[in-house]
Swiss-Prot record:
GO terms for cellular component: cytosol. Catalyzes the condensation of pantoate with beta-alanine in an ATP-dependent reaction via a pantoyl-adenylate intermediate. This is Pantothenate synthetase. (R)-pantoate binds at Q61, Q153. Belongs to the pantothenate synthetase family. Pathway: Cofactor biosynthesis; (R)-pantothenate biosynthesis; (R)-pantothenate from (R)-pantoate and beta-alanine: step 1/1. The keyword Ligase applies. Its main location: cytoplasm. It is an enzyme of class 6 (ligase). The gene is panC. The lineage of its organism: Bacteria, Pseudomonadati, Pseudomonadota, Alphaproteobacteria, Sphingomonadales. GO terms for molecular function: ATP binding; pantoate-beta-alanine ligase activity. It comes from Zymomonas mobilis subsp. mobilis (strain ATCC 31821 / ZM4 / CP4). ATP binds at residues 30-37, 147-150, 176, 184-187. Beta-alanine binds at Q61.
Length: 287
């Protein structure tokens, strides 16, 4: 496995692979890797001949008073985990390598970036799509792999790739959860012991809502209230947003008919905001 820090060196290696007609899969991450990321790497391994995993804490997707300075980093741990999980190349550039001077160009999927999580994190998704566009230009992958936990991000990246005619196919991978149901996240490491125990309320409330929908509940306000009451029963949880949307368009809904939906949560525990989601389709059975 190679660990590469410069764009020029990465391109040189990937050009050799392309000359040998090898398919390239890209897994973009911000590091501090966990089993959720490894599920993405394993999917990339299945879908491609060469797996590139990028590690870059992207400053332009963090807002004022967000957690850029305290975002967890551990490159030696990440390297060891990638070696165990079939990654061929880690691309771990510095900020100066990616943004050698103040960036003047950005990429934004306008309408989708300013709703849902975007209401609370202005310019966040513009930062995400800008770095993903740069990585697509640098790596030129055949496949790019994202987790479904960051569901709005997945939908936005799909739209950007379609709108800008990138060749890469976007593949989404289902959420990987801890044994108690908490979605794997790098931010989990920043939770206190008490907040970590409390955070399981997210997956629990989503499963209850899923069950209620599959039992026939159609009214979105009823489902939202069910989730809100459940989360508020945990004193350590502070709700940032609860959204119930069309699963592919992200339109907010008043009523659930036969369309696939997604329930999106953003909830703070102390100064750590966790996100989670549940996809529900009409023929799905409750877990």
């Amino acid at each position: 496995m190679l660990v590469i820090h410069t764009i020029a060196e990465l391109r040189a290696h990937l050009d050799e692979h392309r000359q040998n007609r090898r398919k390239i899969g890209l897994v973009p991450t911000m590091g501090f890797l966990h089993q959720g990321h490894m599920a993405l790497a394993q999917k990339a391994r299945e879908e491609s001949d060469v797996v590139v995993l990028s590690i870059f804490v992207n400053p332009i997707q963090f807002g004022v008073n967000e957690d850029l300075d305290v975002y967890p980093r551990d490159l030696p741990h990440d390297i060891a985990l990638c070696k165990e999980n079939g990654v061929d190349i880690i691309f771990a550039p510095s900020v100066a390598e990616i943004y050698p001077e103040p960036i003047m160009t950005s990429v934004e999927v306008q309408s989708l970036s300013n709703i849902l999580i975007g209401r609370h994190r202005p310019n966040h998704f513009r930062g995400v799509t800008t770095i993903v566009a740069k990585l697509l230009n640098i790596v030129e992958p055949d496949k790019i792999i994202f987790g479904e936990k960051d569901y709005q991000q997945l939908i936005i990246v799909r739209r950007m790739i379609r709108d800008l005619s990138y060749k890469a196919e976007v593949i989404g991978v289902p959420i990987v959860r801890e044994k108690d149901g908490l979605a794997c996240s790098s931010r989990n490491a920043r939770l206190t012991k008490e907040d970590r125990a409390a955070a399981v309320i997210l997956s629990q409330s989503l499963k209850k809502a899923q069950k209620r929908i599959l039992e026939g509940e159609k009214d979105v306000s009823t489902i939202r209230q069910l989730i809100e009451d459940d989360i508020k029963s945990e004193a350590r949880a502070k709700i940032q947003s609860i959204d119930i949307c069309h699963a592919t368009k992200l339109d907010t809904l008043d009523r659930i008919d036969n369309q696939p939906i997604v329930i999106l949560l953003a909830v703070a525990f102390g100064d750590v905001v966790l996100i989670d989601q549940q996809l529900v389709t009409p023929k799905e059975k409750a877990l």
